[in-house]
C-alpha cells in the first residue's frame, strides 16, 4: 500500500506512540523529514543494515558500507564512521534509481515525488535553485558532533531536472567540520550553485 496522506512537518514517529503505519508513511517520514525512527523501522523490515548493504552492492555500487542502524549510531557515535559512501557513489545510486527499472513505476514515482517534497535542508542543494525553473528532489543527512566538537556529517544528495529535458544527480558531503550546521549547509549550497552554473554553460 503506497497511498498515504502527507504527514505533519513538526512530528516524528517517536511522538506518535504505538500505531500502525504504512510503508508509504514511513518513507515520507524518513525521506522528507529525515526521521531516524522511520529509517530503523524500514531497516528492520528489509532484514537489517547488512541486507540493505548487499542490495546496494548488487546494483553495482561498491564504495558504500551500511553497518549500523540510526539507533546504534546514536548510542556510539564512532559507529557513524562505519556507515559511509562517497559523493560519487551516492550520485551514481541516484542515477540508477532514476534511470533503471528497479521496481514498478508506481513506487518509483512515489519516491521521486516524496524527494521533490523534501522538507529538510532547504538551505542546502535546493537553496540556489529556488528561483530557477528546475525540479529538485533530494535527501539530507545531518550528523551529531564528535568528541572533538566537529560535525560528523552534513550531507545532501539529489537530482535536478532542467528545462529542455537535461538532468543531473549531485551529492555533497561535509565531514568532520569545525563549522556549525548553518555554515556547512551554506558550503553545500555554494557547491550546488557552482555545479548548476557549470552545467547551464555547457
Regions found by a protein language model. Give the residues of each.
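Carbohydrate-binding/catalytic loop surfaces
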Residues: 73-82, 133-145
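Mid-domain, small-residue-enriched loop/turn segments at the edges of structured enzyme/sensor domains
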Residues: 19, 40-102
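Single conserved hydrophobic/aromatic residue that forms the stacking wall/gate
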Residues: 1-8, 12-13
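Charged/polar, low-hydrophobicity segments characteristic of intrinsically disordered regions
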Residues: 16-25, 67-75, 120-136
